[in-house]
Regions:
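Adenosine-nucleotide cofactor-binding segment
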Residues: 1-47
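Local beta-strand N-terminus motif with an aromatic residue
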Residues: 9, 32-33, 76, 116, ...
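Glycine- and other small-residue-rich loops at beta-strand/loop junctions that grip anionic moieties
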Residues: 13, 34-38, 61-62, 96, ...
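Solvent-exposed, non-membrane alpha-helical residues enriched in polar/charged side chains
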Residues: 21, 25, 49-50, 74, ...
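Glycine-rich phosphate-binding loop and adjacent beta-alpha segment
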Residues: 43-116, 141, 148-151
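A short, charged, Gly/Pro-tolerant segment at domain boundaries
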Residues: 124-132, 145-151
Length: 151
């Protein structure tokens, strides 16, 4: 939580000990958020619907919490919100190429200028890859784990 706040987040939620729906409602004066980018899915969908604003968008980009779920469609409809699922893998090669080129032309310059910067938790030499893997498996990282390859 402290690390995320230090990166500049206006509102931080520890989902293991706080109800993120209540936190979002309180932080937005009950209006909800405009966009939710969800990599978990599963049981989070109902809570995401509770957090979304009128005309908001939920973009499902992963299903780490499970791909099958039941949710209250009746809660989504009055908000006139949309739920979009997307993955890169299922897209045609031409579309993947176009997206990669757009990323290179629009996003990479933001990293090069310093406007965006990756959050790196730790760096490991290639010879310590097993240690890096164990660290990742412990789920204690905040940000990316980088493996340096001498070359």
């Amino acid at each position: 939580v402290d690390a995320v706040a230090a990166l500049g987040a206006d509102v931080v939620v520890d989902y293991t000990s706080q109800d993120f729906v209540e936190t979002v409602k309180r932080a937005t004066d009950g209006k909800g958020v405009d966009v939710i980018l969800d990599v978990i899915g599963g049981e989070y969908l109902d809570r995401n619907v509770a957090c979304i604003a009128v005309r908001g968008r939920i973009v499902q980009v992963g299903v780490m919490g499970g791909g099958n779920t039941a949710f209250n469609l009746g809660a989504l409809m009055p908000k006139r919100a949309s739920l979009t699922g997307t993955v890169l893998r299922a897209r045609p090669l031409e579309e993947k190429i176009a997206l990669s080129q757009r990323f290179s032309s629009e996003i990479i310059p933001l990293f090069e200028s310093g406007l965006l910067r990756p959050v790196i938790d730790r760096r490991y030499p290639f010879t310590a890859i097993a240690e890096a893997h164990a660290f990742m498996g412990a789920n204690g990282n905040i940000g990316k784990i980088v493996i340096d390859i001498a070359g």
